[in-house]
Amino acid sequence: DATITSISFVSAATAAGTPTNQWFALYDSSRNLLRQTADQATLGWPANTLKTVNLTSTYTTTVEGLYYIGIMMKATTPISVHRRNVGVAAASLALTQLAPILAGASSTGLTDTAPNPAAAITADDSIFYGYCS
């Protein structure tokens, strides 16, 4: 078992411009919400910066397997998230659409609370850099 206390993501070249809501969330493989961070609301997030936010309470894993972490920012200019493209766009997108989908967009129109469960994931050809600790 592992105890998770926080989630981290790294911003890329675009800093947050006038954020109104921002949080991270932890989901199981069925996209059921396990924990989330408090809404960081209007706190700034500079470009090229690691941001670590504590969960509202710790989570201890009880099963091995796939977990998802999510990031949400509502802002006039959301950050760009540091990510790595998987490869040639057409070929890599086809690969990333194989189950289980490991990265992509999910629920939309969010503000201060993570959805439970999160919507189906639309695959992306790049992987965001984020982790739990």
Roles of regions detected by a PLM:
Residues D1, D28, D39, D112, ...:
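Acidic-enriched, low-complexity/disordered segments with a strong bias for Aspartate over Glutamate
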Residues A2-T14, I69:
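A short beta-strand element within beta-rich, extracytoplasmic domains
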Residues M72-S133:
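Short, surface-exposed beta-strand/loop patches at domain edges
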Residues T3-S8, T52-N54, T58-T60, S80, ...:
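Ser/Thr- (and often Asn-) enriched beta-sheet segments in non-cytosolic proteins
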Residues T18-L98:
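Aromatic- and Gly/Pro-enriched, solvent-exposed loop/edge beta-strand patches characteristic
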Residues A2, P46-L50, A105-L110:
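A short linear-motif detector with a strong N-terminal bias
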